[in-house]
Amino acid sequence: MNVLKSSLLAAAAVWLSAGASVAQAQVRITEIAPWASASSTPYQTDWFELTNFGDTAVNLTGWSMDDNSNGSAKVALTGITSIAAGESVIFTETAASAAFLSTWFGDQAPLGLQIGNYTGKGVGLSQSGDAVNLYNASGELHASLTFGSSEGLTQTFDNSAGLNHTSVSQLSVSGVNGAFAAVNDLVEIGSPGAIAAAVPEPQSYALLLAGLGVFGIIARKRQR
């Protein structure tokens, strides 16, 4: 192998590594039910869903959340230590996993669906409009979604697209993005633990393809 080829391969490896790192920590807030604690739901607790759109598992140890107080009252996420690539997990405000699973799935809960908790003063999700802010182990804001009034609603806010640092208003509709009516509470509509296939964000692929293209051009020019 000549020096040129060796250099190109080394550079390509660095570029590919950089591209992969872009996708590794793409955890997004993909569903929110801010009405669940104030309504007549059997489990009586608000909840939200996180989805890993990256290409490797993400360690959630030390991660935390807050509502629209933006970090001043943040509390730890507990009960889940890792979220696999493509996996969606649920966090409820109180420990109500058994009632939650029974309400949504009856006795057919998805195998391996993870449910964690967040508990503390000042982090209840308001029906008049609020936010979910997600912080990584370094205390940095990693993902956030705001939402408007949910008074009178029994459909979750649906962010299956994985949008970040924005507002969500789309409501879950049965048959769309995996949404369904809860087995034991038919007025509730959502898709806890299931969204369209999570894949690395487009910019990751664009970066990888661009890098390979650049190295290919350089190699051809050197060979002339």
Where in the sequence are the language-model features?
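Compositionally biased regions
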Residues: 7-8, 18, 22, 103, ...
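Glycine-centered flexibility sites
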Residues: 62, 86, 129, 190-193, ...
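A recurrent domain-boundary module in secreted/ectodomain proteins
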Residues: 169-198
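C-terminal membrane-anchoring or membrane-association module
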Residues: 216-224
